[in-house]
């Protein structure tokens, strides 16, 4: 037994966060299934605009200066899975996959609401940019430089998602705002 463990021994190839959200699962799923919701609850993704390719969105990731991020959301309503397929700098190979699932809390916790499970896998591209020619030349960081902070960062984002959904639900507002409809 040790008093301190290296990040890799604790988290390894996966980063998983989860939380209870006091919001009906179908409403939370519908909100999350819209790619533009990421602009509200993530730390750094802003300015989503559709691309010429149906279902593919372009935004700016403020973690990297002048960084474009491409996102396609693959959602399954019946299973309530929402997977965000993303990549910095180019939209042809979306290799950063954010796997999310919204579970009916009544089934697993015997109370109304949702449980959100979120997992990222440490893709080899986190270690080295596979498309350096697409990167802005002045950018000093690569998304993989932040891997050790994914757990803390994603938990913060999940807490933001929770706060938004719970506030809207508690106040009788649509969880998915009108501007997204």
What are these regions (language model features)?
Residues 1-53:
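Hydrophobic ligand-binding cavity/cleft-lining segments
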Residues 23-25, 77, 105-108:
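Short loop segments at secondary-structure junctions
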Residues 26-29, 155, 159:
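Amphipathic alpha-helical segments that line or abut small-molecule/effector binding pockets
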Residues 89-156, 163, 172:
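Beta-strand/loop substructures that line and gate deep hydrophobic ligand-binding cavities in soluble
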Residues 171-181:
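Charge-rich (especially acidic), low-complexity segments
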């Amino acid at each position: 037994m040790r008093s301190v463990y290296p990040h890799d021994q604790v988290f390894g190839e996966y980063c998983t966060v989860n939380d209870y959200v006091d919001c009906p699962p179908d409403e939370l799923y519908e909100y999350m299934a819209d790619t533009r919701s990421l602009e509200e609850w993530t730390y750094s993704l802003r300015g989503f605009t559709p691309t010429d390719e149906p279902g593919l969105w372009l935004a700016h990731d403020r973690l990297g200066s002048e960084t474009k991020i491409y996102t396609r959301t693959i959602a399954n309503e019946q299973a309530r899975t929402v997977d965000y397929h993303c990549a910095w700098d180019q939209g042809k190979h979306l290799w950063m996959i954010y796997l999310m699932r919204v579970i009916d809390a009544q089934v697993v916790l015997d109370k109304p609401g949702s449980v959100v499970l979120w997992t990222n896998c440490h893709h080899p591209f986190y270690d080295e940019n596979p498309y350096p020619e697409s990167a802005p030349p002045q950018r000093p960081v690569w998304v993989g430089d932040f891997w050790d902070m994914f757990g803390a960062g994603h938990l913060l984002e999940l807490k933001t998602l929770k706060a938004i959904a719970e506030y809207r639900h508690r106040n009788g507002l649509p969880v998915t705002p009108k501007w997204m409809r």
